[in-house]
From Swiss-Prot:
EC number: 2.7.11.1
Induction note: Neither up- or down-regulated in response to zinc ion contamination and in response or to mixed metal ion contamination (cadmium, copper, lead and zinc).
Protein name as it appears in the record: Putative serine/threonine-protein kinase
Record InterPro entries: CR_Ser/Thr_kinase (IPR052059), Kinase-like_dom_sf (IPR011009), Prot_kinase_dom (IPR000719), Ser/Thr_kinase_AS (IPR008271)
Family: Belongs to the protein kinase superfamily. Ser/Thr protein kinase family.
GO molecular function: ATP binding; protein serine kinase activity; protein serine/threonine kinase activity
Assigned keywords, A-Z: ATP-binding, Kinase, Nucleotide-binding, Serine/threonine-protein kinase, Transferase
Native organism: Helianthus annuus
Domain Protein kinase: start-end pairs: 49-242
Superkingdom per UniProt: Eukaryota
């Protein structure tokens, strides 16, 4: 089956045929480089996707730690894709559409992707301190070391990321799944909002969109769950739970 990726048309090639530069909403170059990786390159980077390099797993696939040929440490998400049902395909496209042109210190950086037959991979910066869920909701030892200064900095960082997504970038982005496991932490415990597989784009002037309810129970806003009307406030509610 031949698949079409409209979102990949938002990139233009450079002299290196493995590197593309994203375009902004006005057709100009945003300056953010987005790389198209080969499956072989990613397989080598994480030692054949060995279990020792697996750092996480969820309903959409597994995440592996890897090292690129230039020494860059990355996290490689290998999506579970079923082409007939499009399972995983929508999440893949949503992630690229949301992050390919977004640049903020509190958003996870998307280096690029891999599209080969049924293979769909996304390549991000590697986060040394895992996630907020791991650090704060995991072992008691981790939780005890997570002092109030770290907690405040994490909350401020996530708030800044949401302000950027909701107001500063165009089209605006509603994440739809803000939760502790989707807030990653770098080596200095700086927060990076991640996992945009459920994200929706809002054009300028759009106050809400009607869509199926998706997200995580406990973090979903009651208004969205009942009405299926998604707004920026849905993310704000999830942030309040966080």
């Amino acid at each position: 089956m031949k698949m079409c990726f409209p979102c990949l048309q938002c990139f233009c090639s450079t002299s290196d045929d493995k590197v593309v530069v994203s375009k902004n909403d006005k057709g100009g170059e945003s300056g953010k480089k987005f790389r198209l990786f080969s499956y072989h390159e990613l397989k080598v980077a994480c030692d054949g996707f060995s279990s020792k390099n697996k750092v996480g797993e969820g309903g959409c696939g597994a995440v592996y730690k890897g090292r690129l040929t230039d020494g860059t440490m990355v996290a490689i998400k290998v999506l579970s894709v079923e082409l007939e049902s499009m399972r995983g395909e929508r999440e893949f496209i949503s992630e690229i559409a949301a992050l390919s042109d977004a640049q903020h210190e509190n958003l996870v950086n998307l280096h690029g992707c891999c599209v080969e037959e049924a293979t769909r991979c996304l390549v991000y910066d590697y986060m040394e301190n895992n996630s907020l869920a791991y650090q704060f909701l995991g072992r008691e030892q981790n939780r005890n070391s997570f002092d109030w200064t770290k907690r405040k900095n994490v909350l401020l960082g996530v708030a800044k990321a949401l302000a950027y997504l909701h107001e500063e970038i165009n089209p605006h982005i509603v994440h739809r799944d803000i939760k502790a496991s989707n807030v990653l932490l770098d080596h200095n415990f700086n927060p990076k909002v991640a996992d945009f597989g459920l994200a929706r784009l809002f054009q300028e002037g759009t106050s809400h969109i009607s869509t199926r309810v998706a997200g995580t129970l406990g973090y979903l806003s009651p208004e969205y769950a009942v009405s299926e009307r998604l707004t920026r406030k849905s993310d704000v509610y999830s942030f309040g739970v966080l």
